[in-house]
UniProtKB/Swiss-Prot annotation:
UniProt-recorded name of the protein: Cell division protein FtsQ
Lineage per the UniProt record: Bacteria, Pseudomonadati, Pseudomonadota, Gammaproteobacteria, Vibrionales
Family annotation (Pfam families): FtsQ_DivIB_C, POTRA_1
Organism: Aliivibrio fischeri (strain ATCC 700601 / ES114)
Gene: ftsQ
Ranges in the topological domain labelled Periplasmic: 45-256
Gene Ontology biological process terms in this record: cell septum assembly; FtsZ-dependent cytokinesis
Membrane topology per record: Single-pass type II membrane protein
Transmembrane feature ranges: 24-44
Family membership: Belongs to the FtsQ/DivIB family. FtsQ subfamily.
PANTHER family to which the protein is assigned, alphabetical: CELL DIVISION PROTEIN FTSQ
Keyword Transmembrane annotated: yes
Keyword list, A-Z: Cell cycle, Cell division, Cell inner membrane, Cell membrane, Membrane, Transmembrane, Transmembrane helix
Domain POTRA span(s) in chain numbering: 50-120
Amino acid sequence: MIKAVKMNTSFDKEKVRKHLPGAIFLSLVVITSLWLVISTISWMTDEDRLPLSHMIIQGQLKHITADDIREAIDSMDSIGTFMTQDVNKLQDALLSLPWIAQVSVRKQWPETIKVFVVEHQPEATWNNRVIVNPEGVVFNAPMSDLREPKPALFGPETSSKDVLDFWHQLQKQFEPIHVTVHSVALTERLSWQVVLDNGIRLELGRDSREERVERFIALYKQLESKKDSIDYIDLRYDTGAAVGWKSDDVENKEEN
């Protein structure tokens, strides 16, 4: 047989009265804390608070100016506050400048951004359109920005590093004969053509490139006294070379 049990639902008024002040105090603390958090977040994200109004620029600037950097950042749709601005977006905006190779942006409390810039170093021009850095990487800066003459390199779009490496090699090999390389071209058929600073054009062809360069060096030592009259030297032979002279007289063409 199941007996019914009557639940005691009466409140202990004394106990409630005893704990009520503590509960009210705790509630006030929680509410106040939430209000402070919300107010702080609102204050820190307010565009009128902590605006990024100062900039420190570091790095050696030769081809761009501090004004170029400021204009790139000002061109963004909007610039946030110290708390809201994503530095990656600032970096992306600066990397759109053609002379910037690397950039690092940091925020400094309370209203400053620090920008460290590394410029591309121009080593040569490429296909009379753009510029190559010392690693053979092409970057799309205007050639008119160059402050001194650079060697002219030509070739298929993906060959910039190979052509630059060959130019470096020739510069070293030609030091003993006191000539420098004005331009190096690799044709679509992978044939090499070199123009020296004295205007002499070398036809090296596709094969036996290293041997033909050595052959030219030996030949040039013999012809150095006549260098001002030489138009081109064609080394696309198993042995020897054909020398083309600037004179129109075909009798001045020599076979060596």
